[in-house]
Every structure is written in structure tokens, then in C-alpha cells.
Amino acid sequence: MKAVLPDSKMPKRWYNILPDLPEPLAPPLDPETDEPMESEKLLRIFASELVKQEMSMERYIDIPKKVRELYAKIGRPTPLFRATNLEKALETPARIYFKYEGATVTGSHKINTALAQAYYAKKQGIERLVTETGAGQWGTALSLAGALMGINVRVYMARASFYQKPYRKTIMRLYGAEIYPSPSDRTEIGRKFLSEDPNHPGGLGIAISEAIEDVLRDEKARYALGSVLNHVLMHQTVIGLEAKEQMKEFEDPDVIIGCVGGGSNFAGLAYPFVKDRLDGKADYEFIAVEPRAAPSMTRGVYTYDYGDSGGLTPKMKMHTLGHTYYVPPIHAGGLRYHGLAPTLSILINHGIVRPVAYHQTEVFEAARLFAKTEGIVPAPESAHAVKAAIDRALKAKEEGKEEVILFNLSGHGLLDLKGYEDFLDGKLEDYEPEELPALRGEV
């Protein structure tokens, strides 16, 4: 069972949650002064239209025609499936649906914001976009977006993933991007971390620092971010806006689930539904899933912190483990991040979104069952949502409830097979920090 929307039903506007949040978003702080960040400084880092969108209180923002045309070319609208074989295997009365972002040409949801960011950069005359990537999904998406828009792309990829997932960098190079393992010897911050540990596995926080340092050296370059900030999450709401239309062919969901690193794929599916709950039109339950190795939602502190490891970004008020936290080299590279989207942090604080955390071995076990029943190999990140959906379906079985579960399968794992090989060979290790910098006041 699946629902596929015609191109004519593709969303024409993104949904911006800022005017509907239960409290105002705290302003970003200048890392040099700890005062609210002036927009002029943000304009040196980001494309100007993205800075405008980041601050906008407009509830809906038009998707440019060029971006919508490219959305159609890369696979939007994406299909929504019912996981009937998984339901049978679990012997649950629950009905499980998933939005499949792996159907895009790059294999994940990341292309949704990559095309938008590259479009606005090209319109401004920017010549190069520089970014970070964890597992490589975001780097792949921006590399293609740059190729389609005629903009050069440079990617700093977390070193652990650079070697765990070698074919990701092959695809990025095929699309014309430059790619470097992070930490690298190309930046001052990269050399600092390499001097401390020549085999440093890196992480999103370090890669972000390197990308921003790189951008600040080149007036014709700007930074593109794959998650966390509001404009990125807003671009992803095409997922949830499509899903709302598709679920009309089936039934209304009771619970909505997504994995979380910075928060973009969760927000993409959930935020259009969150609006209905905030408006009092529905009583949806929202579950955000993270790895126990990077538990920013379940164990982090809500405070101002840097978005990167080197302290170059504005400080944001968010759930954080502390920007100095060393995230272990789990295979879900896209979830190896110390912080969290500020908008999602607020929703968690108000009890609208409930976070849960899992070890990677139990996540891969859930992914194996999903692959055997539904035929799709989930990305390790997306497999966290699979695990939560399975647990929820088993709970419904215990309680005899015919619950309707919707989750975001944000990408496929066909280029993440080293993690699956390690899982099948019994080589996966679970990580859970005993101490966290944020709990010691180190932010």
C-alpha cells in the first residue's frame, strides 16, 4: 500500500514554525561579545535570503519556481508506504506508515534544503559553497545542488565517516565537489585537533568549524548548513506537507516519529503536524529519536552554546552536550552532533515532543527486521526511527490498541554497508558517555 502525489500536489510554500512556537526563539549571540548577533555578521557567513528566512515571522514562504521544478526532477513528491509486512512480523494491531525520503536521487531528505540554499546563493552571485557533512548525505546533496546551479562546492567530511563510507566521497567527487576528511590540515582549527590526535575521528562540530574558517577567508564563498537552523528545517517541511496530503488516502496518525541529529528530518515530517497540535486541531504525539552516544535531547542542558567545536559560530540557546564533547564514532554519522535545533529544543521543553535514545546495536537489529520485511535497507540514522516505530507497535500490541504510527525513513543505507557488515559480524560497539561537558558547566 502506498500513496504517491502528482506533481501538481507538490507543496508551493514551506511552513515556518517561528510564529507558532509556544515561546519566542532566543536570539543568537555574537561569539565575540555575547550580545545579540547583528544580521550584518550573519551575511558574511550565509546567503542573504537565508538570513532573511532565518529571522522571518511569515508563517508560509513561497518556494521559488526553479526550486519546485528541481524538486520534481530529483524525486518529489516522495512516496508514503504502509509497512504491512512489518506489521505482520510484529503481530501488532498498530498500522505503520513511513514517508520514504530515500526515493530522491541522492538517497535522503537533504536535497530538499540543498537545492534551496544553492538557488539563493546562485541568485546572489556567490561562487562557492562550503559545508560540513557527517555520514555524507548532506555533502552529497549539496554537491548535486551545486552542480545543478553552477556553483562550486567544498565539503569537510567527519573523518570517521570519510573512511567508513568511501563511496559517499566518490559520489561527491562525481558531482564535482572537493572533499576533505575533517579534521584536516587545511584550517587552523583542523590542525589544532590533528596535533592533539593524528587519528582524530572528527565530527560535525569540528567540520562546521573548518567550513566556517574556510568561508571567512574567501569573500566570494558562503557557508551552507545541513541542519539545526530554522531556514534549513523550514525547507524540509515539504516532507510533512506532502505526508499530510498522502495520509488523507489512509487515516490520521496518532504518533509521528523521526530520528534527530540536528533536527531537520524530524522537523520536516513533524512540524506541519505540530502546527495542528499547537492550533488545538489534533492531539498528535511526537517522538524524537537520538543515539545514546550523542544524547543531547535526553541528557543535554538547555543553554547557550556554540554550534561548532571551535567556537566560531554564533551561540544558540539549545539542548547541548557541550561543544567540546567528543562524539564516539558510531555508524550513524549524521547524528554525531553535540547540539540541537533551537526550535526543536523549545518544543521538547514544552512537552510537545518526547525524546528517546537507543544504542546502535538495537537500532541495527531493528533495521535488519525492516529490511527483511519491507525490502529497504535504512540509513543508520533513519534506523533510529525504525526502532522507535517498532517499539511503539509492540506497545500497541501489549495494550491491544489499533494505533496509527507514521515515521520518516529519511534515507537509504546502501552506501552505509560497513556498519551493517560490522553488525552482522558482531563487531559493533555501543557507546554511552558517563560525563558530559555541559553537565560540568563547560559550554
Swiss-Prot record:
One of its GO terms (cellular component) is cytoplasm. It is an enzyme of class 4 (lyase). Pfam families: PALP. It catalyses: (1S,2R)-1-C-(indol-3-yl)glycerol 3-phosphate + L-serine = D-glyceraldehyde 3-phosphate + L-tryptophan + H2O. Disulfide bonds: none annotated. The modification N6-(pyridoxal phosphate)lysine is found at residue 110. Keywords: Amino-acid biosynthesis, Aromatic amino acid biosynthesis, Lyase, Pyridoxal phosphate, Tryptophan biosynthesis. Pathway: Amino-acid biosynthesis; L-tryptophan biosynthesis; L-tryptophan from chorismate: step 5/5. Its cofactor is pyridoxal 5'-phosphate. The keyword Methyltransferase does not apply. Signal peptide: none annotated. GO terms for molecular function: L-serine hydro-lyase (adding indole, L-tryptophan-forming) activity; pyridoxal phosphate binding; tryptophan synthase activity. InterPro entries: Trp_synth_b-like (IPR006316), Trp_synth_b_CS (IPR006653), Trp_synth_beta (IPR006654), Trp_synth_beta/beta-like (IPR023026), TrpB-like_PALP (IPR001926), TrpB-like_PALP_sf (IPR036052). Tetramer of two alpha and two beta chains. PANTHER family: TRYPTOPHAN SYNTHASE (PTHR48077:SF6), TRYPTOPHAN SYNTHASE-RELATED (PTHR48077). The beta subunit is responsible for the synthesis of L-tryptophan from indole and L-serine. Belongs to the TrpB family. HAMAP family: Trp_synth_beta (MF_00133). This is Tryptophan synthase beta chain. It comes from Thermococcus onnurineus (strain NA1). The gene is trpB.
